[in-house]
Amino acid sequence: MSNKKQSNRLTEQHKLSQGVIGIFGDYAKAHDLAVGEVSKLVKKALSNEYPQLSFRYRDSIKKTEINEALKKIDPDLGGTLFVSNSSIKPDGGIVEVKDDYGEWRVVLVAEAKHQGKDIINIRNGLLVGKRGDQDLMAAGNAIERSHKNISEIANFMLSESHFPYVLFLEGSNFLTENISITRPDGRVVNLEYNSGILNRLDRLTAANYGMPINSNLCINKFVNHKDKSIMLQAASIYTQGDGREWDSKIMFEIMFDISTTSLRVLGRDLFEQLTSK
């Protein structure tokens, strides 16, 4: 479904206090920040906003940790490991908070992926394809690698009631609206969001069970079916819609929103620290 309003509403949904935005400061304004750097700024903002709590940032989680978390739920889980030092490394890293019992709990996991250079190629007048006579390049499947990290974090957080995994998408393979790009020779090329050649969003919506994109889905959803109650861990998937690059300030606001949602879910396990003088 084409939804230009989804892109426009991003700047309206995430209004933060001047104090939190101030964390961004001159440094952020002067740099094109990678998602990992934004995660570190979110961690700093959380520390300022909640001085009673301890936060940490790390760039990877070992597979042994994931298996240990699974074993705590059921001894039949987490028993297979072939490479002892294997780990996962989301490009935005992981932000955690220490709870009242001294355990580190995940409040944010972030990734940013770019796929599809059609907009840049058209603006530069480049033609693609085997014979160099096409405006559009058939989309690849590299983005599907994101499913691995999402699945691993879901395993790591299987005992939690929240899933703060956010995936930022940009590039011509993630359009949610039709756009027109002008070549240097003046010819206009139309990119249609529902083109099977271009769009790869449907390759990722399995990670959020087909729920809305550009939405904070951090709180796990419980659904009832017959005699079963099923917990859904949905990734929060954000796309610009028109293929452009993400503004790091908007990324910061979305990531801070998801982090504070995590803290609300974890509230009873943070109560002692939050109420201590």
From Swiss-Prot:
Gene that encodes it: ecoRIR
Q: How is the cofactor bound?
A: Binds 2 magnesium ions per subunit.
Q: Which family does it belong to?
A: Belongs to the EcoRI type II restriction endonuclease family.
User: What does the annotation say about its assembly with partners?
Assistant: Homodimer.
Q: What organism does the record attribute this protein to?
A: Escherichia coli
Record-given protein name = Type II restriction enzyme EcoRI
Keywords from the named record: Endonuclease, Hydrolase, Magnesium, Metal-binding, Nuclease, Plasmid, Restriction system
Tell me one GO molecular function of this protein: DNA binding
The answer to whether keyword Metal-binding applies is yes
Catalyses which reaction(s): Endonucleolytic cleavage of DNA to give specific double-stranded fragments with terminal 5'-phosphates
Q: Please tell me where Mg(2+) 1 binds in this chain.
A: 91, 111
Q: Which cofactor does it need?
A: Mg(2+)
Gene Ontology biological process terms in this record: DNA restriction-modification system
Q: Does the keyword Translocase apply?
A: no
Residues bound to Mg(2+) 2: 91
- Effect listed in the UniProt record for changing residue 144 to D: Only nicks double strand DNA
